[in-house]
């Protein structure tokens, strides 16, 4: 039986590569080539194994940790596929979540799929790797997470991890792209309680102050608006879906996408909050539209119970959100 050797920069391994491995594994013995000269090969292999576990492939796929010279010497029993060169590449995943991204011909060698550049994952520009790998990267602070922790306190960072995880679960349950949900949940508080927002204060005032009493944006609202500027400048993220989910996660507004709603509710009901929210989480899992309205109503009731309600919630964005979704 011939064996496949897949060659790519698997640092970290991406969703498309995992899908290819899963398909090929039905008909071939699959090997993943890792260059033994890489200084961080041990961690790369550990991360690959996390992805293989998510795809139930951990005991079926072999990781070939050898040099390139040794790879070239392998005999004709091995079919070598260079995924970086044999896949049509457009630098980014553009198909919608859960659509078929590729097919294999009758020999299961020819592929037509959307290429994912692993460096985009390293930089935090896209999150299209397995959920266990995302958790490893963010919890153990690898790749892009090394930059994120520069701006967030320990408690704030723990909060964004919880929001990211809840966002992923709710999105997955509602057939919404869970990787974008994790990404938006993870980045949503990037400019909260740090000096980053000061760099963008003038831009935000000019664009959004008209929605607030006396044209003054409350301090706790700034970070939702400044986030997208930091995402673009620091991480080169240009995805408007991510921008928008972060832009209104505190105030809400009257034309929210499903992704916007996922991040909004996840921020409000993550388990670190000091009020019971498990029933709201279940409602969101079952139906994000019903869950969003339930969370919005619960949040409105909570804010109205506060003595400072008139000063914290009387902005046109939140008022429009209540009017559109609760009336």
Regions found by a protein language model. Give the residues of each.
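Nucleotidyltransferase catalytic core that binds NTPs
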Residues: 1-147, 232
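Histidine-centered active-site/metal-ligand motif
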Residues: 10, 14-17, 159, 188, ...
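Divalent metal-dependent catalytic cores for phosphoryl transfer on phosphate-bearing substrates
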Residues: 52, 61, 149-151, 168-295
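Charged phosphate-binding loop/patch that engages nucleotide di/tri-phosphates or the phosphate backbone
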Residues: 126-147, 302-327
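All-alpha helical catalytic cores of prenyl diphosphate-utilizing isoprenoid enzymes
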Residues: 152-156
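Long, amphipathic alpha-helical surface segments
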Residues: 288-309
